[in-house]
């Protein structure tokens, strides 16, 4: 996963847990594609201060993911749902008659995992 995409995804899940300043810097840098210098000028701080704040925010987001794993769970669930769609497509076309039963099994596993949360 590219770093840019990874941080945006982590921010979607855990961004509200960051400080307001970290949230603002992440949004400006990753969301609005401003440079460190542009953010520094806007907040009347040094580029180094912006860089340090971004790195701390990125590390905090990564730590949340390591502990909670919500992005990982979402990604795995998405892959499973794509597999279900493919199996059902095969079932409908007659190419994979076992697709319906396999799909049910995958969906049951997803539900079981959600109930464990």
Curated annotation (Swiss-Prot):
Reported function: Might take part in the signal recognition particle (SRP) pathway. This is inferred from the conservation of its genetic proximity to ftsY/ffh. May be a regulatory protein.
Stored CDD domains: Sigma70_r4 (cd06171)
SUPFAM superfamilies, alphabetized: Sigma3 and sigma4 domains of RNA polymerase sigma factors (SSF88659)
Protein name: UPF0122 protein Dred_2057
Family annotation (Gene3D superfamilies): Winged helix-like DNA-binding domain superfamily/Winged helix DNA-binding domain
Family label: Belongs to the UPF0122 family.
Origin species: Desulforamulus reducens (strain ATCC BAA-1160 / DSM 100696 / MI-1) (Desulfotomaculum reducens)
InterPro entries per UniProt: RNA_pol_sigma_r3/r4-like, UPF0122, UPF0122_fam_protein, WH-like_DNA-bd_sf
């Amino acid at each position: 996963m590219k770093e840019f995409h990874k941080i945006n995804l982590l921010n979607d899940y855990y961004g509200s847990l960051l400080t307001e300043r970290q949230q603002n810097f992440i949004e400006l840098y990753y969301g609005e594609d401003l440079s460190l210098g542009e953010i520094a000028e806007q907040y009347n701080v040094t580029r180094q201060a912006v860089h340090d704040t971004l790195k701390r925010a990125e590390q905090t987001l990564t730590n949340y993911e390591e502990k909670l794993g919500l992005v990982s769970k979402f990604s795995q669930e998405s892959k499973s749902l794509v597999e279900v769609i493919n199996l059902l497509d095969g079932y409908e076309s007659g190419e994979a008659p076992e697709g319906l039963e396999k799909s049910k099994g995958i969906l049951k596993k997803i539900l079981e995992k959600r109930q464990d949360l």
